[in-house]
Amino acid sequence: MQTNIEDAYTQLITLLDQHGAHYRLIDHAPEGRTEIVSPMRGNALSQAAKCIVLMVKIGKKITRYVLAVIPGDARVDLQAVKSLMRGTYVTFASPDIAERLAGSVTGTILPFSFNPELELIVDPSLLENEEIYFNAARLDRSLALKTGDYIALAKPRLGRITEGRGTSPGAPSHS
């Protein structure tokens, strides 16, 4: 597991380069909020991968963590995640747990899980775009990645986990 931002960034770039992924790096002013950084990058909110770490209780004894990845113009549907995970309770993970599991700080969480304790679930509506955009484990650098390469490398579980599109984000942005 990564222990700092540089590790997460390096791990991501190494993975992409080793597999010949098609991506572009985009430098910008430090910003982690999807609705603010998207215009800086020149992408539509629907192309932004908003990444949210959730805690799901399964019964009384089992706790699982989910990295929910949704379009930037949508809100995560907690009940849909709970149902998909066959959980009994779902909530947002605390920032310290989210950052430990994701290997980067809030606002820079990658739409990849390099941690076996963090299950990656992606809403398929994000994958309708030719490219997806996200902060590259840094507030001052983003990445545009071909969607086909993202699917091949991240190997996400797909599930409809959004409440709606085109609404103001109701959850903290962790893209």
Describe the residue ranges of each PLM region.
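Extended, low-hydrophobicity, polar/charged segments
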Residues: M1-S175
